[in-house]
């Protein structure tokens, strides 16, 4: 295990702070979506009534604060270090959902969260140091190499297929559609965010990077990707259980982001086989935790559902493949 550099330490502190804010924002935003769904069309049905709900905006502000901290973290540390710390937002979100939204988290779900943290910690302790980048043009060169251009093209094709073919047909019954869109676009967002963060960092150090058009192209990419992510994340939150959206979104987002970072920044080029293997083991541990959360998803809800007839069918979590559990929603008021 290598000693962490000062930049990596700064990145970790910012990433942890970001996870706390973002984890809270999931819960606050969902409260807003619940309130908006009572009086109008739900976000999952194409409604935008949540834009008039103060709770939703409070959640957005909380998320923005978290994203700013996350944004700053990418200026100091590699994506393979910053991104896995999103596991902390899973735990914070799941615990708050248990107490505030009454989306019950079983003891095996708690174990799944612990595994996510252990895996993330393993990755952090063996993460590579940030490579020296002295200009946004250097990042642009990395982004326009054939490998990353091919990755970006594949992402765009898959996202367009999900939006125009799969989302209208399977969006409300298969969480993977919404989460897939957010995760794939998120990997491009992170690469562009890192470029912009580096440009800002270098500009504050006296080397203005915004005189180059490359920086502005990265800003445009970030804006477009963020708008898409917010829209489809709202639909996911409105249709499915928060305690499971968070870990599944985290795993998919982290997987694609690490893959994108490997291709673009070649994070593992300077590491030994043992270090890479240890990081992969950490990631497998995270996947195991998420699998455990998914497989035990109904345990925390079955008792309360049997004991009460006042719950809406929408209180029962619906996950990646759940085509038969939404049919009753069209015959009753839209209440989360």
From Swiss-Prot:
Subunit info here reads: Homodimer.
Q: Which residues lie on this side of the membrane: Extracellular?
A: 1-7, 77-79, 126-145, 201-212, 266-272
- The protein's organism comes out as Arabidopsis thaliana
Matches recorded under InterPro entries: Mg_trans_NIPA (IPR008521)
User: What residue spans carry the Low complexity bias annotation?
Assistant: 321-330
As for what it does, the entry says: Acts as a Mg(2+) transporter. Can also transport other divalent cations such as Fe(2+), Sr(2+), Ba(2+), Mn(2+) and Co(2+) but to a much less extent than Mg(2+).
Any GO MF annotation of the entry: magnesium ion transmembrane transporter activity
Residue intervals annotated with topology Cytoplasmic: 29-55, 101-104, 167-179, 234-244, 294-336
Its name, as the record gives it, is: Probable magnesium transporter NIPA2
Supply the alphabetized keyword list.
Cell membrane, Endosome, Ion transport, Magnesium, Membrane, Transmembrane, Transmembrane helix, Transport
Q: Tell me how this protein sits in the membrane.
A: Multi-pass membrane protein
Belongs to which family?
Belongs to the NIPA (TC 2.A.7) family.
Which biological process annotations from GO are given for this protein? magnesium ion transport
UniProt subcellular location: Cell membrane; Early endosome
Q: Provide the primary localization.
A: membrane
Q: Where is the signal peptide?
A: none
Q: Which domain of life is it from?
A: Eukaryota
**Entry's transmembrane regions:** 8-28, 56-76, 80-100, 105-125, 146-166, 180-200, 213-233, 245-265, 273-293
């Amino acid at each position: 295990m290598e000693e962490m550099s000062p930049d990596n330490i700064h990145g970790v502190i910012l990433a942890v702070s970001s996870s706390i804010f973002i984890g809270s924002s999931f819960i606050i935003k969902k409260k807003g979506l619940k309130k908006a769904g009572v009086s109008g069309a739900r976000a999952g049905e194409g409604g935008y009534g949540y834009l008039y709900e103060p709770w939703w905006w409070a959640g957005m502000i909380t998320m923005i604060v978290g994203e700013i901290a996350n944004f700053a973290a990418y200026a100091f540390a590699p994506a393979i270090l910053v991104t896995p710390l999103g596991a902390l937002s899973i735990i914070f979100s799941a615990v708050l959902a248990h107490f505030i939204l009454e989306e019950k988290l079983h003891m095996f779900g708690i174990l799944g969260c612990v595994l996510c943290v252990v895996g993330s910690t393993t990755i952090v302790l063996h993460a590579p140091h940030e490579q020296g980048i002295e200009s946004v043009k250097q990042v642009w060169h990395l982004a326009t190499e054939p490998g990353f251009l091919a990755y970006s093209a594949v992402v765009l094709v898959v996202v367009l297929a999900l939006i125009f073919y799969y989302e209208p047909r399977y969006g409300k019954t298969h969480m993977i559609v919404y989460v897939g869109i957010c995760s794939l676009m998120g990997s491009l967002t992170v690469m562009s965010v890192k470029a912009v963060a580096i440009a800002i960092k270098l500009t504050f150090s006296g080397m203005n990077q915004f005189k180059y058009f490359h920086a502005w192209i990265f800003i445009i990419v970030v804006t477009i990707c963020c708008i898409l992510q917010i829209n489809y994340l709202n639909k996911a939150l409105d249709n499915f259980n928060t305690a499971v959206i968070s870990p599944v979104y985290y795993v998919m987002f982290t997987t694609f982001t690490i893959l994108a970072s490997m291709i673009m920044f070649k994070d593992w080029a300077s590491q030994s086989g043992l270090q890479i293997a240890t990081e992969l083991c950490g990631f497998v541990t995270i996947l195991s935790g998420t699998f455990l959360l998914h497989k035990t998803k109904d345990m925390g809800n079955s008792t309360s559902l049997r004991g009460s007839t006042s719950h809406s069918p929408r209180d029962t979590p619906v996950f990646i493949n759940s085509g038969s559990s939404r049919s009753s929603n069209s015959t009753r008021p839209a209440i989360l």
